[in-house]
Amino acid sequence: MPKPLVYRVQNHAARRLHHDFRLEIGVALKGWAITRGSSLVAGEHRLNVAVEDLVLDYIDFEGVIAMGYHGAVLMLLWDRATGEPDGDCAAALATGSAALTLQGEKLIGRWRLERMKSRLCEEHVSWLLVKSHDAARERGDLDILEEQPRSVLTGRTVKDIAATAA
Ligand code: MN
């Protein structure tokens, strides 16, 4: 039985609000930025782009970090859980396809991470986060992002967190 992985989703308010999907691989949190956010809709493909690893110390970070010239970064801890990979997740990711089951507070069920074929000149590697046809929602159902926008850590919204930094 593979070792469960720590998994987090942070709502990251940058130029545009997006989700950072994070998985504990080895000693770091691997990350993917999901432009349109996570989805519970069966068969839905969400484009995500690999981003820099994060040290495990920041796993439950929520709040605002001043970034000097670049302004401030706001993070809301949107979901947390352990994920159960089908086998060795690091090895599966290296091959470009990994399946896992999440038991989050918001994201529950099975997903696949699929690496897209990329051109050599591309700076960032694109992946797809694909929701499996398990106990998922259907198209037209309420969007989990609209239904549950609050932090799993503090119950705050992005607006609440922004207000504390003002
Ligand atoms: Mn981000």
Q: Model-found features: residue ranges?
A:
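A charge-rich, low-complexity, intrinsically flexible signal that marks solvent-exposed coils, linkers
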Residues: 1-166
